Amino acid sequence: MFLFLSALTAPALAQEGPGSNPIIRDKFTADPAPMVDGDRLYLYVGHDEAQRDEMFNMREWLAYSTTDMKHWTDHGPIMHVSDFKWAKKDAWASQTIKKNGKYWFYAAVEHDNTHPGKAIAVAVSDKPTGPFVDAKGSALITNQMTPKGTHSWEDIDPTVFTDDDGTTWIAWGNRQCYIAKLKPNMIEIDGPIREITPAHFEEGPWLHKRGKLYYLTYASLDRASHRDERISYATASSLNGPWTYRGELTGSGKYSFTIHAGIAEFKNEWYIFLHNAALAIGDLNGAIGRRAVTVEHLEYNADGTMKPVMQTDAGVSAPPSGK
């Protein structure tokens, strides 16, 4: 299905052109995770289905793709949480990467009562749009593997990154941020799990590299001064750290307590995907469990730091500020 989803929501949104925000307008979506494969950028999102006073109701993950950042193809659901037979509920944040000719999908779910709490699942497919199947038959990471946390949702929001030497790393967490290597089979942790929690870390880590610098971007919450999450980041010359806090990259998402970043370089331009709660569909307004994915240009300073990102309605329909 080929779409620019403008006509299916409030009139104020319907007047915006291709590339404007939000990207997806016929469904509530959250936790964007881009992946570039050839001349196409794929975007994986969680499907927010909360009704009225529900907090979160997320049962499936969706995929979209584009070749120009303005027109998007809807590939439909790629997995349901029930596809992980050991999982109980909650199709939370995910990321997909390509390695060795296959597509590996990592996602946070609620484990059944054999391992209570949140867990990280891994699935695999021969195609970026699926079908994906459980690659392990059990969780990659469970709450019992990170005993420092004081809450059952510590092990969420995986980000996966393959370094130049071919080693794949996974980072994740809520309140604490953890990192570990993956074995070449992509379904087992290789070595120790280490904590790398940067300043004000709340959740939603995202790893990427530009030049020789590694970036850890994440949802931050300074409880002394803020009520809603913002995006902050840290940098390092090695994934082993030390990580240097670089400050806030964005403000909070409009009408949303949560925010979640995904970053990609596509056709020589950098982009940051986010979510807010500014979309209305029919008689349902945006809310904590009804969010909308957006995209903005991402620019860098000469020293490698990222320029602050303003969240806009125009999105990438407008050129980046440096051009």
Regions found by a protein language model. Give the residues of each.
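Carbohydrate-active catalytic/glycan-binding domains of CAZyme proteins
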Residues: 13-323
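Bacterial N-terminal signal peptides
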Residues: 1-10
